[in-house]
C-alpha cells in the first residue's frame, strides 16, 4: 500500500502588497528605477533643506515610495514574511535615491543608515531650519576644510 505524502502547505495569501502587478503597490519596482538615480535637480545643502525635502516628498510620492520615508511601511520582523525581501529591496532603493540627492560636501556628515525612515529622521534633525546652530556648525566646518598634505583623491 502506497503512502500518500501530505499536501504542500498553501501559498501565502496574495495581499495588496504581494501583488506586484498592481501599479499602486509601494513594493513594486519599475524596470526604469535605478539606485544611481538622482531624484531631484537641487541637491541637499546646508541652506535648502525645506525646499529639498518638499521636492523629495513629491518625487517619492510619484513613485509610491513615501511610506518608506515617513515610516508607515515598516520592515517585517519575520524574515520568512513574503514582504521581508520586498521591503528590503525597496528600502535600499529609497536609501540610494536619498544618498544620491545629497551634495558631495554633506555626504560625509550623513551617517550610513540602512533604513530610509531613520535616514530621513536624521536628515531632518541635522538640516531642518529650526536647527540653526547645527547648520552654523556645519558651515563653519565646511569653510575650514583644508587639503593639507593629502592627495586630491584622499581629500
Predicted feature locations:
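N-terminal Lys/Arg-enriched interaction segments
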Residues: 1-155
Amino acid at each position: 500500500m502506497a503512502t500518500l505524502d501530505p499536501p504542500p502547505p498553501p501559498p501565502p495569501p496574495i495581499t495588496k502588497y504581494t501583488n506586484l502587478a498592481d501599479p499602486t503597490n509601494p513594493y513594486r519596482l519599475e524596470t526604469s528605477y535605478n539606485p544611481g538615480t538622482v531624484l531631484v535637480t537641487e541637491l541637499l545643502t546646508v541652506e535648502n533643506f525645506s525646499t529639498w525635502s518638499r521636492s523629495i516628498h513629491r518625487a517619492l510620492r510619484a513613485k509610491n515610495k513615501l511610506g518608506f520615508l515617513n515610516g508607515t511601511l515598516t520592515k517585517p520582523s519575520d524574515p520568512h514574511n513574503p514582504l521581508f525581501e520586498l521591503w528590503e529591496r525597496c528600502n535600499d532603493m529609497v536609501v540610494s535615491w536619498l544618498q544620491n540627492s545629497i551634495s558631495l560636501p554633506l555626504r560625509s556628515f550623513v551617517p550610513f543608515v540602512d533604513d530610509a525612515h531613520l535616514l530621513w529622521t536624521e536628515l531632518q534633525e541635522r538640516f531642518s531650519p529650526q536647527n540653526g546652530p547645527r547648520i552654523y556648525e556645519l558651515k563653519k566646518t565646511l569653510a575650514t576644510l583644508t587639503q593639507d598634505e593629502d592627495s586630491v583623491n584622499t581629500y
